[in-house]
């Protein structure tokens, strides 16, 4: 999956991934292989994407959160060590290919100590296949551009965030 490698390399060169941060990943493996979101799913594609992200994690120290599909209310699979009980609520569900999606399922099975949380608020994310990760990204979302527009057949959208600017005409920001 050369597009994914190129995408991740470009993001690393832009310092997109930071140690001790969480990046949410949404992915439709169906879309990657050219099918309608939620229709087919591919554990092979999920494995390739997960393994590529694991390499990034090892290189940069970033953690990844894997958004499930709408059938589990887009709940997010994370490592227990990333869980913050003050800002996250654990839920009882195990992602499955048909209720959670292939990537969240693969991640749950291959993470060290996975848990699923209802919602997170993280500074950045990568959406492969228009899975609607925006609900998990801090305000204010800012698009990130790379040369890679698709992974396989899936459209890729990347976002980071910035603090809100408040105050009005008298406020100073710099």
UniProtKB/Swiss-Prot annotation:
Belongs to the UPF0340 family. This is UPF0340 protein SH0921. NCBIfam families: TIGR01440 family protein (TIGR01440). SUPFAM superfamilies: TTHA0583/YokD-like. It comes from the Bacteria. Transmembrane segments: none annotated. InterPro entries: Antibiotic_NAT-like (IPR028345), DUF436 (IPR006340). It comes from Staphylococcus haemolyticus (strain JCSC1435).
